[in-house]
UniProtKB/Swiss-Prot annotation:
It catalyses: 2-formamido-N(1)-(5-O-phospho-beta-D-ribosyl)acetamidine + ATP = 5-amino-1-(5-phospho-beta-D-ribosyl)imidazole + ADP + phosphate + H(+). It comes from Clostridium botulinum (strain Langeland / NCTC 10281 / Type F). NCBIfam families: purM (TIGR00878). GO terms for cellular component: cytosol. This is Phosphoribosylformylglycinamidine cyclo-ligase. Pathway: Purine metabolism; IMP biosynthesis via de novo pathway; 5-amino-1-(5-phospho-D-ribosyl)imidazole from N(2)-formyl-N(1)-(5-phospho-D-ribosyl)glycinamide: step 2/2. Its EC number is 6.3.3.1. Keywords: ATP-binding, Cytoplasm, Ligase, Nucleotide-binding, Purine biosynthesis. Its main location: cytoplasm. Belongs to the AIR synthase family. Pfam families: AIRS (PF00586), AIRS_C (PF02769).
Amino acid sequence: MVSYKEAGVNIEEGYKSVDLIKKYASKTFTKGVLNNLGSFAGMFELPKYKNPVLVSGTDGVGTKLDIAFRMKKYNTVGIDCVAMCINDILCHGAKPLFFLDYIACGKLESEIAAQLVEGVSNGCIQSECALIGGETAEMPGFYRDGEYDIAGFAVGIAEKDEIIDGSKIEDGDILIGIASSGPHSNGYSLIRKLVEDLHKDFEGNKIGNTLLTPTKIYVKPVMKLLEKYNIKGMAHVTGGGFYENIPRMFKEDFTAVINKKSYPLPNIFSHLMSLGIEEDHMYNTFNMGIGFVLCVNEKDGENIIKDLIEMGEKGYKIGYVKKGNKSVELI
């Protein structure tokens, strides 16, 4: 007789990982959570809204995970997973409610799984949302030893008449960029081609650790700004950089004019460019130091930047909107 364990699935290790994961998930629970982790489904009670709309998003971390495997550092990529989902739904003004994760591996190691979920938990705490469920799949022979994949699913809520969809954007509105923490979770297939020695020094740290800096989560500053200002459009700068993501906030045919010299370019991007990437390709691939973009009325610009600074963020007027063809023009 062949056992499940002999086939490569360790049920006992699965039980152990669930116990380790529960303590991290419970730290994220908010008032709306109705049941504990381990049920067949997570349940969440909706707060009182007049005309609520649920806003959802799903994403993963991509090949940044390979850097984590090679550095044997697993407790930050969970933050990336949350950030990639949460920042997307934030673009429509949604307040995050809850999050679910999915972890897949060839051989389950409970301590590594727990570190991954520790990162997810930290990301949820930063996002003020609850981790109410997830799945850990052990699939022997499907993944190479020591490799994991992680993805997530986020749900937020917004009043229907307060959803930000870009329909109020006008010619002459300005664009405010909020600084990123590095490459975030995009462009790592290219980075891995160029950076072979992850233990090489970069500004007093191993470059592998620098590349594992978690994706910034913009929930707290943006939700505070939404209480005070008429924000007309928002963009999460991910894969495709400025060129692909900023036009996604436009409902009509506008062009975003971005001044490359309006903010300081972080050294990690200058370093990557020095390894052989053309500048235009950099802007087509990376966030180039700006992880989130707001489209606002010009009269609010200075006050928004001031508020961002007071909240510990770096905000810059990076450009403006003009009539065009859903494109980005760099100057």
